[in-house]
Swiss-Prot record:
Domain of life: Bacteria
Locations listed in the record: Cell membrane
Recorded topology in the membrane: Single-pass membrane protein
Cited Gene3D superfamilies: 6.10.250.1580
GO MF terms, alphabetically ordered: proton-transporting ATP synthase activity, rotational mechanism; proton-transporting ATPase activity, rotational mechanism
Lineage: Bacteria, Bacillati, Bacillota, Bacilli, Lactobacillales
Protein name (record): ATP synthase subunit b
GO cellular component: plasma membrane; proton-transporting ATP synthase complex
Length: 176
């Protein structure tokens, strides 16, 4: 209707201007009432919302910083754990090598000791055998000498004496 009045040039009925004044007055009254009763509450709600958003942003930033810090600490702990594991492995290898070296030395010493003992035992047995042979030869020599002194030997008697003595030696060795 207003458009027709402006475009066509018709005169507007008087009710349109009155309606505009009433609507404008009602709008002003509504604005004043809103300002007096509701504007403070609306501004408070908007302020609270703004503060909440700001707090949420701050909280998100703090969470991001805390997460970055925790990630850095986790990385440091991981590196520390890896270095500790490498140190433990290194120590275990060194300990194993030391144990191996110690066992090798002990085994070598034991083998050397056993060889030396065997040499000593063999030497002692040989000395005892030689001593025994010497004693037997001496006894045999004394027995032969005693038999010779007791008898006057002719070549046949001498041969018979040697044969009997050899037989007695054979019997003595068989009994041992």
């Amino acid at each position: 209707m207003l458009l027709t009045t402006l475009v066509v040039g018709e005169t507007a009925p008087s009710t349109t201007l009155g309606t505009m004044i009433v609507v404008s007055g009602a709008f002003l009254i509504l604005m004043l009432l809103l300002k007096k009763y509701a504007w403070g509450a609306i501004v408070d709600i908007l302020t609270q919302r703004e503060e909440k958003i700001a707090n949420d942003l701050d909280s998100a930033e703090q969470s991001r910083v805390a997460a970055a810090k925790m990630e850095k600490e986790r990385q440091q702990q991981l590196l520390s754990s890896r270095s500790e594991a490498a140190e433990i492995i290194k120590n275990a290898k060194e300990s194993g090598e030391q144990t191996r070296q110690k066992t090798l030395k002990e085994t070598t010493a034991e083998v050397t000791r056993l060889r030396e003992k065997a040499r000593t035992d063999i030497s002692q047995e040989r000395e005892e055998a030689l001593s025994s042979v010497k004693n037997e030869v001496a006894d045999l020599s004394l027995q032969i000498a005693a038999k010779i002194l007791n008898k006057e030997l002719t070549p046949d008697a001498h041969e018979a004496l040697i044969d009997s003595y050899i037989e007695s030696l054979g019997k003595a060795n068989e009994t041992r």
